[in-house]
Regions:
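Bacterial N-terminal signal peptides that target proteins for export
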Residues: 1-8
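Predominantly soluble domains enriched in secretory-pathway, periplasmic, or organellar proteins
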Residues: 10-11, 16-317
């Protein structure tokens, strides 16, 4: 190989490696500020605020983490923000009232259209909606199984989880859960799904292979209205936000027994766990703050002011 060609290939490889480096930024959607707060996770300080559009709620990364996607409920669009330059790149048509979404490893965005009672599949590369899938009333949470073969959508008023085959985009099962299901998370091995039910005050455990609920537990937190749920790195623990109960419930993933309660800010909503599992970030919607929790001690180690009514949070680390 000629030296010039080798040098060029090495330069390209180094550039790709540099682009893969994390930014160590935490991104927070602020529902009533129409903005995205960008936090430096190393200093726990807000780096900047990005105007994104009307009523930002659901938030996620592209598979390469080069872009942040934000659902704009009052614009019927998905905002695309460059995760490094922090510039608003474009807006993609999403269908009516997008609330939450999940990004498939192939790059497609699976989203809930809350007031249209459907889920949509959006290709960010072309900007086209590839499929529209009827589901229950007021679809909310969306998750994709670790193997990428299923999407799950919760419907708040139908009290169900709708299981959708990928790439067929057909509903294969409708699973009744607790009242007003909000969010779904998965074990890393793809065996279990965990579903929060806001009005029911419950967490349910769903066997993905059989599409059956195997266990449901009430949270041991007064006035708990569970919303967000994430699974710990070792798969042994669930962290569940409790809405107006102003706490995070720490739950055994095997037995659904509650192990601890962590007091945070008012109306705790979206959650995100750092890649190494050592830090949990919570959106406190009525305090306009984000709490940072040390998961080794279950203690809040920082409280960060952000925009008005923080809804969702993700971290690039």
């Amino acid at each position: 190989m000629k030296p010039m060609v080798l040098t060029l290939l090495l330069a390209i490889a180094m550039l790709q490696l540099a682009m893969a480096e994390p930014t160590y930024r935490v991104f927070v959607s602020n529902e009533e500020d129409n903005s995205l707060s960008v936090i430096d996770s190393r200093s726990n300080k807000v780096e900047t605020t990005v105007a994104v559009g009307e009523r930002p709620r659901g938030i996620g990364f592209s598979p390469d983490r080069a872009h942040v996607y934000v659902a704009l409920g009052d614009e019927d669009a998905i905002a695309v923000v460059d995760s490094r330059t922090l510039q608003l790149v474009k807006k993609l048509p999403s269908g009516s009232d997008p609330e939450a979404f999940a990004v498939h490893p192939n790059g497609h965005i699976y989203l809930s259209n809350e007031d249209a009672n459907k889920a949509s599949v959006l290709d960010p590369a072309s900007g086209k909606v590839l499929a529209e899938i009827p589901v229950g009333i007021e679809p909310e949470g969306v998750g994709i199984t670790p193997d990428g073969k299923l999407a799950m959508v919760t419907s708040e008023s139908t009290h169900m989880v709708h299981i959708i085959a990928i790439p067929e985009h057909k509903v294969t099962a409708n699973v009744l859960v607790g009242a007003r299901p909000r969010e779904v998370a998965f074990s890393a091995d793809g065996r279990w799904a965990y579903v929060t039910s806001e009005i029911g005050g419950q967490v349910s455990k769903l066997d993905i292979a059989t599409s059956k609920i195997v266990q449901t537990a009430q949270l041991d937190v007064p006035n708990a209205k569970p919303k967000g749920v994430v699974v710990s790195l070792d798969q042994r623990t669930l962290y569940v936000s409790t809405g107006g109960a102003n706490a995070v419930a720490v739950v055994d993933a095997d037995t659904l027994t509650q192990k601890a309660t962590i007091a945070v800010g008012k109306r705790v909503w979206g959650l995100a766990l750092s890649r190494d599992g050592s830090r949990l970030y919570t959106c406190n919607g009525l305090d306009n703050t984000v709490s940072v929790i040390d998961t080794a001690t279950n203690q809040v180690i920082a409280t960060i002011p952000v925009g008005k009514r923080p809804w969702g949070v993700i971290i690039d680390d």
